[in-house]
């Protein structure tokens, strides 16, 4: 069973790209808070956050691409209504 992502056992779960976009927004907010701090620690944290943001943006692009592939090949997901997965097996109990 998934903790956050939508599945046949968790129809109220989230789409991966939605979680990644939310996480990216949170990190951008955190960056805004520390942007004026010029201490070495803050500068390093900001540099780390910028790298993380790049990786998150790449992950969002990949997640959106996967959704487009599945939508094009199998139609819209019915997971939110408790439908079966479009690929793979159903979740084990």
Give the residues covered by each predicted segment:
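N-terminal acidic leader/helix
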Residues: 1-34
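General helical secondary-structure elements
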Residues: 2, 20, 26, 47, ...
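Intrinsic disorder/low-complexity signature
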Residues: 5, 23, 29, 45-46, ...
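Intrinsic disorder/low-complexity segments enriched in polar/small residues
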Residues: 10-13, 45, 59, 79-82, ...
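Short, charge-rich amphipathic interface segments used for partner binding and complex assembly
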Residues: 32-79
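Short intrinsically disordered terminal tails
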Residues: 1-4, 76, 80-93
